[in-house]
Amino acid sequence: MNFDYRLATINDIDEIMIAVEDARALLKEEGNGQWQFGYPNRQDFINDINNQNLYVVLSSDTHEIASVCAITGYEEAYMHMYEGKWLTDYDYLVMHRVAVKEKYRGQGYGKALFKVFIEVGKKKGIKSLRIDTHKNNSLLIHLFDLFGFVYCGKAILPPDKDRVMYEKVLD
């Protein structure tokens, strides 16, 4: 699948929030408490936009926003795994707040976000990518596995508490 991506702008916020609400509804439908208690919210995404950390993938036909993720740097909570350890001590990027609009599910736009994550890491000269999720988020964990992320352990991250942690070392 060919796709375009770019940094999000403040003009994208309403479209981004549609993807977020679609993802929130899917998590709830699957019995996953992740994203059910006010996080992430509109202001979190506005902050990501202002910090130039929020990326959007555009649909190949209409060029509207199909999926979204934040790509950030150092994460203090990642230093405090209570089980396991990271593969490396390299500088790293983290992907957070992954969401795909309902009408684009199953069309490769979640995979596209991981391709963006890897490409951004390589462009920035980063050797390690890290990501976490709720232990019951099977769709996201499937993508971690598909893209070669390795399970490293568990950590406590608010607001969902217990998180599973993964890392991918870039070539």
Could you say what each language-model-derived stretch is?
Residues 132-133, 145-164:
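Conserved catalytic-core motifs of GNAT/GCN5-like acyltransferases
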Residues 1-14:
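Conserved N-terminal entry element of GNAT/NAT acetyltransferase domains
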Residues 70-97, 105:
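Conserved acyl-donor/pantetheine-binding loop and adjacent beta-alpha core of acyl/acetyltransferases
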Residues 17, 24-44:
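Conserved GNAT-fold acetyl-CoA-binding loop/helix
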